[in-house]
Swiss-Prot record:
Pathway field: Bacterial outer membrane biogenesis; LPS lipid A biosynthesis
Cross-referenced Pfam families: Hexapep, LpxD
SUPFAM superfamilies for this protein: Trimeric LpxA-like enzymes
The protein, known as: UDP-3-O-acylglucosamine N-acyltransferase
GO biological process, one term: lipid A biosynthetic process
TM segment ranges: none
Assembly notes: Homotrimer.
Broadest EC class assigned to this enzyme: transferase
NCBIfam families: lipid_A_lpxD, PRK00892.1
Catalysed reactions, as listed in the record: a UDP-3-O-[(3R)-3-hydroxyacyl]-alpha-D-glucosamine + a (3R)-hydroxyacyl-[ACP] = a UDP-2-N,3-O-bis[(3R)-3-hydroxyacyl]-alpha-D-glucosamine + holo-[ACP] + H(+)
Length: 329
């Protein structure tokens, strides 16, 4: 498949510097792009790769215009990364499509479930009683939507997603565990994307809620009664424990953990591998991981960290003693 460079700019905008009739045969990163492929530069720190790239054309910001022109054709736009995202959408729409049934013959759909006629249900999916799947939503293979769970419009659920498994609720009794029945469901808004093998548990009494525009990567665990605000994004292996509330426009890096019953304000960004142990009431970027080091140095630092409390008390005692000496005539 090919697209003319001029056609891309005509559809998506941007300032083209180069031959509009140039044929683009693919999309690729700067370092591996060929003279028939389109690439992009999202950050100035990669400008050395830009100068060395063999790409037919590169999408750049106005600040990188000069560097890009020195090597060849470019499309200048205020947001290169966003522009490239839209190029990928355009490219996918242009690919030849195989006509498939809206509901795969192997899918199991309860008679009491509702699937919109424009929804697409993949192989071996299971949609249980009372569940609802909205218009233009796509469920890839082996997705399970539990009883009474609701999925909105234009959502994309990748293979192996489980919506509405029981939340993890047990009451201790006589040295054993008594199950707390999970009587809520899961409500997912519109334009949500959920990565492969991610699990969203149903609420215990109230619903677990995923608002519009949320993006979840692969292998994420969302516990029961969690509420995730609009347009929040989480990278792979993140986990949110039960009854936590995540605000709108938040991000969680890969492997980040939010403990149960905590609240994150709108606009909170959590670095990868951070464990959030308290509520964060103000927007901002938060990091809680211990820096990596060679093992011997790490053990020394960890040992010192365990002594910080006693070291603080000793320093305070020394400061008090110095103040006493300073006050003497």
């Amino acid at each position: 498949m090919t697209l003319l460079l001029g056609s891309i700019v005509e559809l998506l905008g941007g300032d083209l510097q180069g031959d509009a009739s140039l044929k683009i045969e693919g999309l690729a990163p700067l370092e591996s792009a060929t003279p028939q492929q389109l690439s992009f530069l999202s950050h100035p720190k990669y400008q050395n790769q830009l100068a060395a790239s063999r790409a037919a054309c590169v999408i750049v910001s106005p600040e990188m215009r000069g560097v890009a022109l020195a090597r060849g054709a470019c499309i200048v736009t205020e947001q290169p990364y966003l522009y490239f995202a839209r190029v990928t959408q355009l490219w996918k729409k242009s690919l030849p499509r195989t006509v498939r049934p809206q509901i795969h013959p192997s899918a199991v759909i309860d008679p009491e479930a509702f699937v919109h006629p424009r929804a697409c249900i993949g192989a071996l999916c299971v949609i249980e009683s009372g569940a609802s799947v909205g218009a233009d939503t796509v469920l890839k293979s082996r997705v399970t939507v539990g009883e009474n769970c609701v999925i909105g419009e234009r959502c994309l659920l990748h293979s192996g997603v489980v919506i509405g498994a029981d939340g993890f609720g047990f009451a201790p009794h006589a040295g054993a565990w008594e199950k707390i029945e999970q009587l809520g469901a899961v409500r997912i808004g519109n334009d949500v994307e959920i990565g492969a093998n991610t699990c969203i548990d149903r609420g215990a009494l109230q619903d677990t809620v995923i608002e519009d525009g949320v993006k979840l990567d692969n292998l994420i665990q969302i516990g029961h009664n969690v509420h995730v605000g609009k347009h929040t994004a989480m990278a792979g292996c993140a986990g949110v424990a039960g009854s936590a509330t995540i605000g709108a426009h938040c991000t969680l890096g890969g492997g980040a953990i939010v403990l149960g019953h905590l609240t994150l304000a709108d606009g909170v960004n959590i670095s990868a591998a951070t464990v959030v142990t308290r509520s964060l009431r103000k927007p901002g970027h938060y990091t809680g991981m211990f820096p990596i080091d060679d093992n011997a140095a790490w053990e020394k630092n960890a040992a010192s960290l365990k002594q910080l409390h006693s070291l603080r008390d000793r320093i305070r005692a020394l400061e008090d003693k110095l103040m006493t000496l300073r006050d003497r005539p």
